[in-house]
Amino acid sequence: MRTYVINLDRAAERLAHMRRQFDQLGISFVRIAAVDGTSLSDRELLSFRTLAENGERPYQWMPSEIGIFLSHKLAWSTIASGDDQYAAVFEDDVHVSDEIATLLKDSSWIHNSADIVRFETTLQGMKLARKPISQAGQMKVFRVYSGAWGAAGYVIKREVASWLASSPPRTFGPVDWFLFHPESVVAPALSVFQLDPAPCVQDQYHPDVDSRRNLGSHVLTPTGIAQALKTGSRRLLSPMVRKATGRRGIPYA
């Protein structure tokens, strides 16, 4: 199973961060040169926004979000043209646990019904199947029955990558919404699973503050109404809401 890391040309520190981790685990990876949304022309930005237009729920796309979306589509296209049945995709600001090495070296742990298996946690509540479908090392694999945030670490089936690469990005939010939000045009058709505990977490969500490397974000923070729309639905659910909705947080391994 090949491993891919999405990385901007100007983000050398992030690439070094990923290389240190994977070198220690004996994992090789292929770098995907990320699309820099801030370098796209007005025509290119308009073209994407037109393709992504969702009349019912308009979304105020930022150039950096467009770049991230196009970068994942580039990764999907690369996977679709390869020979591996499954491939792993990471953004370049994640921390990975030692347990992930075994998973990346052998795909036999992946259930044949899985389209996508999420490696990461954002510490947000998720609704999972009551019982795991399988075991992956020290981690359990659960079917996901809710929306999920984050697309910084996942395994994807080649046929699904091909389908997503050729699908128009018609969505009302960033790439993780496209993949995992229940109202997405593609998410309801996907069989998504989650590892618990999660062997991957973005730097900004690392539960140990001292372990964060302050890699920052390539997504500029919106202001005003746009900020409310983008962040309001992403707030961490309170314990009471989690219990009422059957959701639970996924710890980082």
Regions found by a protein language model. Name each.
Residues 1-90, 94-253:
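An acidic/histidine-cluster motif and surrounding catalytic segment
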